[in-house]
Structures are given as structure tokens and as C-alpha cells.
Amino acid sequence: MRELYLKTLKKEVVPSEGCTEPIAIAYAASIAAEHLKGEIKEVNIYLSKNVIKNALGVGIPGTGGVGIEIAAALGISIQKSYKKLTILSNFTEDELKKAKEIVDKNIINIKQKNTNKALYIEVELLSETSKAKVIIEDTHTNVTLIECDDEIIMDNNSEVSEDLEEDYKLFKIADIYNFAKEVDFDHIKFILESAKMNEKVSEEGLKGDYGLQVGSKIIQKGNFNLFSNDASNKIIAASAAASDARMDGCAMPIMTTAGSGNQGIACSIPVAQTARLLDKSEEELARALVLSNLVTIRIKKHMGRLSPLCGAGIAGATGASCGITYLLGGDLENINYCINNMISDLSGMICDGAKETCALKIATGTNAAIQCANLAINGISATANDGIVAKDVEETIESIETLIQNGFKNVDDTILNIMLEKKKNNK
């Protein structure tokens, strides 16, 4: 399992600039634009409901705008698909100007795709003489089709890309814990970059007026503040501030986990902040981050790549709580307690799209992560008498999947309908 865990971390913990759903749209649009011949006359974008939900209201870095249209137009303008999830980094003023001109032409059409896939992106570009189509499925960079003028340039079976993901359900918590504890430090040093990168965004969020300013107001000095300036609130503030900045379009890269920047923030910053407060070594931090990220990835596999439940607040924060428990000296039993406590606490947190208020959910999740780690390290755990918690922690995690599949079937549709109706009424 050692090589599988390392391969997974390198595949799932990767940098991105901005929210991953609109970036994936930009990525697909960029590929299509690179193949199209002639001047673009029409842009048709077909998206799964989950992608629409997560791309509709989120800030696009460096544009001052939000949403799908400007993201797609930037992808068309930039045409640097080799950058994948960093495609929106360091674009020029001319590229932004061209993107805004595309938006202003009102040639971008967005439609919901009738598909069972949570993550589906199809971009079709038309000129007077040419047509190019690109499809991304299942994960944010998994291109399954490139077609130009009825010629298939690439046709990739999306199921192949899921081979590794299918293994994620085999990631038992005991195995993850033992790997994090015993793996050679040299093999996991790379994971430290996730904390370093995300804490830079946190610092920017704390000093800037981003979003709701959730993070900066928690530790605000001078005026009356209900929050005391204690260790836990510093950790919560640092975590929320990174999301404040990211969701308001801060043009800085973030290290994602399992396809989400907010999940990357949620599972890395609380762990890094705790390690610093406890004066832990880089090796101890790396091991805690490995544990946190792999637990997040494991839980996310049961939730789905995109989900009606909040991945950052549930999976990411649970990963963070495990990492914090580890740094506090917890063993496998304490880690199991921690997971049971977290799922008992946060399992009902919905995902109502990517937007500025995600920082509130990260603040809530981080607070729970600290609280549940504190309980776990003191030998206190939710039990099989408590709701969806099971005697075996593996069953507790699996209950999240059952909850989503059987209990949340119509939640995404309901949330998206509310969002679209609101947008229509605000026009």
C-alpha cells in the first residue's frame, strides 16, 4: 500500500488557482479553442448540476467577476491548456480584455446536461467553418473527448481514470495511520508544500478585505470581539481567511485535496497551525498532513467528487481533526474516536455551491476539528448509540455514502433550483 498512498497523494494534492469547477471549464474551453479554426461565433457549454452549482457564484481570480461565462471566456482567450488547473494564473491584460469582449458578445450559452455524473463539462465552440468539442468527466482534468470538425482527436474511456479512485475505499484508517507514522520522511517531504502554499493565501486573507472577512474578524483587535485571542481561534481564523481570499478571487495558487481548494485548506492549515503552536518538527507536521490528506481523500470517495454535502466541512475538517489528534500524541484508537466525533457533528452540512460563505463552513469545520480532537485525545467518542455512528469507524465513514445515496437524492436539484431562480429574479 505504501506506493499506492504516495501515488495517491501526488495525484490528489495538486496546485490550482481559483475554484476548481470554473477552472475545469476554462481548461476545457482552452483545449477546444486550440483546435478550432476561424473566429468563434458561438460557445455552448453543457454542465452537470453539481458543476453549475459550484461555478455559478464564485470569484474568478484577477477578473473582478464571478461565474461560468468569464471563466470559459478566459480559457478561450488564454489557450494554454498545458497548465491544467493553473490555467488562470498570470494571464495578461490583453487576454483578460479579449475574454471580456467574448462575454460582452453574448455568444456563451450555458445548459444543464442530463447526466448521472456529478462532474461533467462539455464545451463546444463554433466558427463559420469549424466546430470543436471537449468533454471532461469524473475528475477536473480527466479529458475524455476532443473532437474537431467531426474528427476524433482523443477518445479516452473515463473508467480507466477511475481505477486508482476505486482503490480509495480500500484505504482503511488503521492502514493510513500506520503509513503516516512509519513511512520514510524523505518520501513525504513534498506534502509540506501544501501547508506552505495554503498558509500564504491565509496570510493574504487575514490582511485583505476579502469576502465576508470571516478569518480576519475572528482575531480582530481594537473593537469589542466575542472571540478571545486564544490558540483555537487563531487556528480557525487562519483557516477561514484562506477561504475568504480564495472564494473572492484572490490570484494566488492554492494546494487542492481531492479536487477542491477548500478541502485542501480545511485539511492542511489547521494541522500546520497546530504544529506551529506545539513547536513540532517538519517531520511531525509532514506525518500529520499525510494522515489528514489521506483521511480526507478516503471520506471524499464515499461522498463523491462533487456532492450535496460539504466536502471541506466534513471530509477536509475530519482529516484535519485526525492530524491534530496525531500531533497531540493520539494513537489509532484516538483517531477512530476523532472520526466518529466529527461525523456525528458535521454530517448534515450541505453544499450550496462555491461562494464567499464557504469560509463560514470552513470556520465551523475547523472549530469542530479542534473540539473533536480534544475529546478524542481524552478518550471520549460518540458511540454506536449515537445516530449514524457505528461501532466500527469504517462503517461510520460508509454511512456518509448511504446518507447521500438514499437520503439526499433531491438535495442538489433543490439547491440548484433555488440558486437559478434567485439569479433569474435578480436580473
From Swiss-Prot:
Q: Which GO terms describe its molecular function?
A: L-cysteine desulfhydrase activity
- InterPro entries for the chain: Ser_deHydtase-like_asu, UPF0597
GO process terms (BP): L-cysteine catabolic process to pyruvate
Which chain regions cross the lipid bilayer?
A: none
- Cystine pairs: none
Q: Which family does it belong to?
A: Belongs to the UPF0597 family.
Q: What is the official name of this protein in its record? A: UPF0597 protein CPF_0803
Q: Which organism is it from?
A: Clostridium perfringens (strain ATCC 13124 / DSM 756 / JCM 1290 / NCIMB 6125 / NCTC 8237 / Type A)
Q: What is the lineage of its organism?
A: Bacteria, Bacillati, Bacillota, Clostridia, Eubacteriales
